[in-house]
Amino acid sequence: MLLDGGILSTSVLGQRVAGVDEVGRGPLAGPVIAGAVILDPECPISGVKDSKQLTAPARERLAALIQAQAVAWALGRAEAAEIDQFNILQASLLAMERAISALSVVPDLVLVDGKHCPPTVCPVRAIVKGDQQIMAIGAASIVAKVARDAEMIAFEESYPGYGFGIHKGYPTRAHLAALKALGPCSIHRRSFRPVRRFLEA
């Protein structure tokens, strides 16, 4: 389904189409998480769009609807250590691959947001700005964003003082100040330049 209300049927010619997107490429800490969603063409979900265009309450409401009504949905992740090991692009593709593999229904076609396709046994196509065009990709971005935000909020208790629940690991002024005062913790991405700078100081 297209987000403008037109149809790129979620079952193109009877095929099961999975939308895939990741969140968390830009933060200095925490995992990158990918969502994979196969929507039910008989149950369109109003309001689905790129997760960045939604408020947190709207994302949470839509994530619950997506999880309840989708044919299948799943999450995949790559940890900070894997991001440091492989680089953020390869870690993002790994998270996508894991999300696709975790689906309870095998898709006939996978549509991925962006320019790069993850390795998968299914036919896959990358669509630039797909999260703004394809409903299943928008849905994937929503479930991934809600899951990652919840995890970063939970890290507040494990790693007090960094403000992860507020900035979600992104390089805000407050986060950089906390890094300077406390140094990196175990979920920081040591290969990212701002974190590496504090490690080398």
Swiss-Prot record:
KW Nuclease (keyword) present: yes
EC number(s) on file: 3.1.26.4
GO molecular function: manganese ion binding; RNA binding; RNA-DNA hybrid ribonuclease activity
Record text on cofactor binding: Manganese or magnesium. Binds 1 divalent metal ion per monomer in the absence of substrate. May bind a second metal ion after substrate binding.
Broad class of the protein's primary localization: cytoplasm
GO cellular component, one term: ribonuclease H2 complex
Disulphide bond pairs: none
Keywords tagged on the record: Cytoplasm, Endonuclease, Hydrolase, Manganese, Metal-binding, Nuclease
Reaction it catalyzes: Endonucleolytic cleavage to 5'-phosphomonoester
PROSITE patterns linked to this entry: RNASE_H_2
CDD domains assigned: RNase_HII_bacteria_HII_like
Function per UniProt: Endonuclease that specifically degrades the RNA of RNA-DNA hybrids.
Entry's family note: Belongs to the RNase HII family.
Protein name: Ribonuclease HII
